[in-house]
Amino acid sequence: MLTRAKKEQLVQEMTDRFSKASLILFTDYKGMDVQTISELRGQLYEKFEDKARYQVAKNTLIRLALRNASYEEEEWKEQVTGTTAILTIVDADPIEAIKIVYDFSKKKKLPVLRGCYLEKVFHDESKIPDLAQLPSREQLIAMVVSGFAAPISGLVYSLNGIISKLVYALNAIKDKKSE
């Protein structure tokens, strides 16, 4: 059993993490054994190292931390019931984390995804499959860069073609004068 001081410390740590988090994902871990939770944590650690934390805590402590971090109680009240575990992502791509947990949940049928805060905006469980389909931050950057690169590449090829024609014309003039 946790002492009062330990509980206060845990609430403070969660409050700090919730305040900085780009993603807070609420899950119901009922039916998950330690091995399954460890497997999910392993996948998250492999991708994010210490930027991701999948944490099981008492609902009363989670509620206190969410209130302290200024999240709207009407949004999360139904999420923090029963067996609750929370995934938080700090300083990393939240969409990639949603994809990992969503795919894990589809494959293992656990954990049950309840809802999330993505960049401080609440999304209920019906939106999570849509969020999991979004491209990751790296994919979006690649799309933008390729969008910028395509017109530049076209310009380079056009200029290259014009210069080649000019060189051919100058060579033709040179050959004609040398005759």
Curated annotation (Swiss-Prot):
Q: Which Gene3D superfamilies match?
A: 3.30.70.1730, 6.10.250.290
Signal peptide from the UniProt entry:
none
Q: Name one GO cellular component term.
A: ribonucleoprotein complex
Alphabetized, the UniProt keywords read: Ribonucleoprotein, Ribosomal protein, RNA-binding, rRNA-binding
Q: Which InterPro entries match?
A: Ribosomal_uL10 (IPR001790), Ribosomal_uL10-like_sf (IPR043141), Ribosomal_uL10_bac (IPR022973), Ribosomal_uL10_bac_type (IPR047865)
- Name any one GO molecular function: large ribosomal subunit rRNA binding
Name the CDD domains on file: Ribosomal_L10
An example Gene Ontology biological process:
translation
State the function annotated in the UniProt record: Forms part of the ribosomal stalk, playing a central role in the interaction of the ribosome with GTP-bound translation factors.
State the family named in the UniProt similarity comment for this chain. Answer: Belongs to the universal ribosomal protein uL10 family.
- UniProt xrefs under NCBIfam families: PRK00099.1-1
What is the name listed in the Swiss-Prot or TrEMBL entry for this protein? Large ribosomal subunit protein uL10
This protein's species is Kosmotoga olearia (strain ATCC BAA-1733 / DSM 21960 / TBF 19.5.1)
Q: Which gene encodes it?
A: rplJ
